[in-house]
């Protein structure tokens, strides 16, 4: 099973690269343009999709102007089953998304593999209404196999500006065994992480080729990193308060 999982993941990554390259490049272009124009990258996901928002936040080798939207009841640590129920509630997103600082110069990623639940859809609609360029990372196969739970009947891929298909199968799990009654071994986190990091890597090069110094975090475990990172945090702390919440930067 170990070999099979690695093989499946490698095949899956190649599938995404071959089918989504144009969309990946478009996303990278929009990220690059947003940062050059004073915007930031914002991300939102529920449940395990939320993991991806943390993967690219405050990340060694990653972009600095990245703001995850943390809504703890929609994560897993305050009750996993409850978080799934909340994600299915129409209009719940209005309790938090309207208070977020989302601007027309921003790019906003919404992460949901099934793409059917109301909260991610409402978040995408709100970000779009505020003028941000919206990008979904979702599975078209999965989405089209299940009815929407949103009151409009729409799915996530139908309400955003750009769709990056992660090509995950319905139910996310890719392995089977005669003695196991349900599919197992999910893929969406591995694939989603690769998609985001690839998009950001391309955006970094686009900025550099345009003569702009890309805002990149250096690993905090490398000597001199604190000084390097401090100036970037100072630049973006107003737009991304979670960078410094609970910590007073030394002058």
UniProtKB/Swiss-Prot annotation:
Transmembrane segments: none annotated. InterPro entries: RpiR-like_SIS, SIS_dom, SIS_dom_sf, SIS_GmhA/DiaA_subfam, UPF0309. GO terms for biological process: carbohydrate derivative metabolic process. One of its GO terms (molecular function) is carbohydrate derivative binding. Residues 31-214 form the SIS domain. Belongs to the UPF0309 family. This is UPF0309 protein GK1441. It comes from Geobacillus kaustophilus (strain HTA426).
